[in-house]
Amino acid sequence: MTIIVTGAAGFIGSNIVKALNQRGITDIVAVDNLTKGEKFKNLAECEIAHYLDKHEFIRQVREHILPYQNIEAVFHQGACSDTMNHDGLYMMENNYQYTLDLLDWCQDERIPFLYASSAAVYGKGEIFREERELEKPLNVYGYSKFLFDQVLRRRMKEGLTAQVVGFRYFNVYGQHEQHKGRMASVAFHHFHQYREHGYVNLFGSNDGYGNGEQTRDFVSVEDVAKINLYFFDHPELSGIYNLGTGRSQQFNELAAAAVNACRAAEGKSELSLKELVEEELIRYIPFPDALKGKYQGFTQADITKLREAGYKEEFFDVKAGVNRYVKWMLENLA
């Protein structure tokens, strides 16, 4: 049985391939665009059966000439995830139409389809629950994800021929994101800031939040891969699910975790947030005028629906997850 993973050389896709490998599954077709050639490193430690360029893959899908038999599932992680990309034509073709064509093909062939949505569909809201009235995307990236989620809702009412699951990823961090540049996680940037400068910067106070007190639902990519495989194991489950921890943590906590993990590798003791600030290992910079009124101070996934689907595992909190991530970066990137 063959499994197809799109975006397989990317951040989340390569972690799904790795998680499948850990189960002994290697009959995997990895689909990606390696124009950014350095991404190959994410697959170098994985076992796959074949690599296929994204453009050739979607051509074969649209013409119904893919040569693979007995496809067990498609994990669709291939998309433009740059929220600052305002090219609507590209975003809608790459994120919406490509995904729609894959959905149609999977439904025709009765193949389970698990795809990446995004918490960006919620915009600047304060309640993050999988309900239409709470979804107000602020950019074309969020809109491209929102629009496809709407397609799934309509299809579910009409009746599906095979499983379809959309995951609304919150702030994901972890191994294999180094190719993302400025779009990599805050944990990634804090690690490199500290290694280069000996301190990390956080935004100062704004909009009722104190220094570094803005919060996010930070979720480890290890948990993200684990949940993708949970739904793969339960083909009776379809729908749209938030994929976060259900816990909102301050940027202060993430910065402290990153700095202390680096210090531990240097044989130094753990410091409290107060001590890290006093020693100027965490510094606060003025909140940018350009972001005032546009910056989200809080996100927290409502994971009630995920728990109702039977997922019982605990998530890494920021301290544990970032500590594991820093150890990986020290071994692989430093």
Curated annotation (Swiss-Prot):
State the encoding gene: hldD
Task: Supply the name of the protein.
Answer: ADP-L-glycero-D-manno-heptose-6-epimerase
Q: Which CDD domains match?
A: ADP_GME_SDR_e (cd05248)
Species whose genome carries this gene? Neisseria gonorrhoeae (strain ATCC 700825 / FA 1090)
Task: Give the required cofactors.
Answer: NADP(+)
Question: Where does the chain bind NADP(+)?
Answer: 11-12, 32-33, 39, 54, 77-81, 94, 145, 172, 180
Entry remark concerning the domains of this protein: Contains a large N-terminal NADP-binding domain, and a smaller C-terminal substrate-binding domain.
Q: Which residues bind substrate?
A: 171, 182, 189, 203-206, 216, 295
Cofactor: binding comment: Binds 1 NADP(+) per subunit.
Which InterPro entries does the UniProt record give? Epimerase_deHydtase, Heptose_epim, NAD(P)-bd_dom_sf
Q: Which UniProt keywords apply?
A: Carbohydrate metabolism, Isomerase, NADP
